[in-house]
């Protein structure tokens, strides 16, 4: 029997934390969550970047991951992203990074967001299982974007690949079980929308590439 979904608001909805005001701003969305059964662990999903969806107006992606989590008997969903910059399309985020890079600044630092890594760690502390769902778009198409790595300016596509590996390694170091809904032909974890939300055990029955590394 399904537990009735509990909808919380404002900073309580986002779980508080040291900097609750940074979980949701006009420019960034660091974390969005729904908890409906506090007796079960929630599922952490890490996508590419957030849309303009809010706690009051969920988008199709968030509705889909909620359905998948409920059908896999999790107690809730915490949605985070590699990049916290809010945009309806990933190109919005990449164009913002390009504009910053044109001024000889770190375009990646801008779209990742100053509090994103801290929020990923804080969210991971609440879960056992993490699903990566950032697709190919997170690691491709970063032309004319520059990032700073070890005090060296590097190209966009190189930085993007190194950064997603860093986040994966971070979740491993925190002892999390790593999954994906499926992988793309390029080997990246697929976005949740192509998948049937009614399929039971969709997450836990998939032997993931991340588990084998």
Language-model-derived ranges and their functions:
Residues 52, 86, 138:
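Feature marks short, surface-exposed loop/turn motifs that line or immediately flank catalytic pockets
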Residues 57-64, 163-166:
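Conserved alpha-helical elements of sugar-nucleotide-dependent glycosyltransferases
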Residues 47-48, 82, 134-136:
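Short, well-ordered beta-to-alpha junction loops that form the rim of enzyme active sites
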Residues 42-44, 76, 129-131:
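Structural motif
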Residues 93-213:
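Glycine/proline-rich loop-helix segments at beta-alpha junctions forming the active-site rim
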Residues 31-37, 60-77, 120-126:
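Short amphipathic alpha-helices and their capping/turn segments at secondary-structure boundaries
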Residues 75-94:
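Short connector loops at secondary-structure junctions
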Residues 1-59, 71:
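Active-site and ligand/interface coordination hotspots across diverse enzymes
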């Amino acid at each position: 029997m399904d537990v009735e979904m509990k909808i919380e608001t404002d900073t309580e909805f986002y779980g508080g934390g040291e900097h609750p005001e940074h979980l949701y701003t006009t420019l960034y969305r660091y974390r969005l969550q729904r908890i409906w059964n506090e007796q079960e662990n929630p599922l952490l999903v890490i996508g590419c970047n957030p849309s303009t969806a809010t706690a009051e107006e969920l988008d199709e992606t968030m509705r889909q991951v909620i359905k998948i989590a409920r059908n896999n008997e999790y107690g809730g969903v915490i949605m985070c992203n590699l990049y916290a910059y809010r945009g309806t399309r990933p190109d919005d985020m990449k164009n913002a990074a390009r504009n910053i890079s044109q001024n000889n600044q770190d375009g990646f630092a801008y779209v990742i967001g100053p509090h994103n890594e801290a929020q990923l760690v804080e969210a991971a502390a609440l879960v056992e299982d993490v699903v990566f769902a950032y697709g190919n778009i997170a690691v491709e198409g970063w032309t004319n974007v520059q990032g700073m790595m070890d005090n060296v300016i590097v190209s966009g596509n190189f930085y993007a690949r190194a950064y997603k590996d860093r986040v994966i390694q971070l979740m491993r170091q925190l002892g999390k079980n790593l999954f994906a809904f499926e992988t793309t032909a390029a080997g990246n974890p697929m976005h949740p929308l192509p998948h049937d939300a009614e399929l039971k055990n969709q997450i836990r029955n998939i032997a993931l590439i991340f588990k084998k590394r």
